[in-house]
């Protein structure tokens, strides 16, 4: 199961872990299928750490799940922030997942069991390199020039009916 994020700086193909994180993947794939993420900016970009998106307001404070409420974390001892390109839900504390997600630029073990890992980049690491190089506001970490998710291709959706 995978999706491709088509961004202003290139494509990122992500394998999603539906068996280990079914609720998170159901939410993510449904948001992808409904074009929810189309036009979202990468609103937070910290070199060596991660890049974040998934908020249609572009502020980093918005976004909602398909259930119109926050949903619970799905942690697994097998899913860790142990390499570049791990994809996780962003949150404001335990069980506060919505629509925002981030992609790591490297190992981030301090995030394990705090953020739900639901995927990994399987193609497009060069696009991740381009995102990491973007100049940002030093206080907010927002890229100086907006970079968007243009649209998303779903390669197979086990939740589609």
UniProtKB/Swiss-Prot annotation:
The modification N-acetylserine is found at residue 2. Coiled coil: none annotated. The keyword Isomerase applies. The modification Omega-N-methylarginine is found at residue 61. It holds the Pfam family Pro_isomerase. Transmembrane segments: none annotated. It catalyses: [protein]-peptidylproline (omega=180) = [protein]-peptidylproline (omega=0). GO terms for biological process: mRNA processing; protein folding; RNA splicing. PPIases accelerate the folding of proteins. It catalyzes the cis-trans isomerization of proline imidic peptide bonds in oligopeptides. May be involved in pre-mRNA splicing. This is Peptidyl-prolyl cis-trans isomerase-like 3. It comes from Mus musculus (Mouse). The gene is Ppil3.
């Amino acid at each position: 199961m995978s999706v491709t994020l088509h961004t202003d700086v290139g494509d990122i193909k992500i394998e999603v872990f539906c068996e280990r994180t079914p609720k998170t993947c159901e939410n993510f794939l449904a948001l992808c299928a409904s074009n929810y993420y189309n036009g979202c900016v990468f609103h937070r970009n910290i070199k060596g750490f991660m890049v974040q998106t998934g908020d249609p307001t572009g502020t980093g404070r918005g976004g909602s799940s398909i259930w119109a409420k926050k949903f619970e974390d799905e942690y697994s001892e097998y899913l860790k922030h142990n390499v570049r390109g791990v994809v996780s839900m962003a949150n404001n504390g335990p069980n506060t997942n919505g629509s925002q997600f981030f992609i790591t630029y490297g190992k981030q073990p301090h995030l394990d069991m705090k953020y739900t890992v639901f995927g990994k980049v399987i193609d497009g690491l060069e696009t991740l390199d381009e995102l990491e190089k973007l100049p940002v506001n030093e206080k907010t970490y927002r890229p100086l020039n907006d970079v968007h998710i243009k649209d998303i291709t779903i390669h197979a959706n086990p939740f589609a009916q």
